[in-house]
Every structure is written in structure tokens, then in C-alpha cells.
Amino acid sequence: MPVTDTTEKRFEDDITGYLLSEGGYTRNADIYDPKLGLFPATLIRFVQRTQPKTWARFVNMNAVEPERKFCTVFNNACDMDGLLHVLRHGFKHRGISFRVCYFRPESDLNQTDAGHYAANELCCNRQWFYSKHNHNSVDMMLSINGIPAFAFELKNQFTGQSVENAKR
């Protein structure tokens, strides 16, 4: 009878493998910016692809470092309205409305809505170093369009770990 690998790494491998093969996720090759709390290149790419005219207006109004400015404006909107609200409804800046993700349309009749939904980038990252203050990490993080949405520690009862270990 083969020995079952019950290590945390194997657990991570299994979850990551499933998300990549069956869940529509990819690995995020872009660089995470802990100061912004985002994968800025991923978020900017999504906005440029799905809202090119809106992005052009924003760049015209913010000619110096528009990408950095956009990420700052996004973070300010999240601080004011909350991340879930911004994910669901987007945000406005100086009269310009932005969406940072699109939900599944009720039908595929509207090709624009279907295309926007298909443009979402779902990514999983392992050993996510989230802090600008230290080198702490969590086992896995899921993001949508460069926005960290769900981070979690994996613990395995077969190795004697519990939720208490994750709290440390």
C-alpha cells in the first residue's frame, strides 16, 4: 500500500493544481507591490483592455505616472467604500467611472458583457509575502485582476496542525 503524502506542501500542490487545471486560475507572473497591496500591472492591464476610452481620459488628466495614480485612487476608494463595494460597483474619480471586475452576465446575448467577464484574470499565488513591514507570508492567495481577494493558511490535521497554528 503506498504511503500518502500528508505534508502542507502537498496540500498546496493539490489545491493549486485544481485551481489551475479546473478552476480557470493562472499563476500571476506580475510583481506584487506590498506598498500598494496590489499586482499593479495586472490591474492596469485589465482596465486598459476592458475600458480603453476611460483609461485614455484618466491618462489625459494624470499624465505623470498614471498607473501609480490609478492604484492610489483605487486604494482610496477601497478605504472609503470597502473592497467588496468597489469590486461589485466600481469607483469614480473626477467624473470618470471605473470597473475593476465584471461578474457573469445573465445571458451571452450581450457580447460586450460576455467579453468583459472573460477578461477577468483569476490568479493564485503560493507563499504570498503580503507585508511591506516584514517577510511574513500566508500559504495561498487568490486575486482577481491583480486585487488580492482571499488569503489563507493551510493546516493539516494529519501533521498535528490546527487553526491555532494559523493564527500565529
Each model region followed by its residue ranges:
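An alpha-helical interface "stripe"
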Residues: 1-168
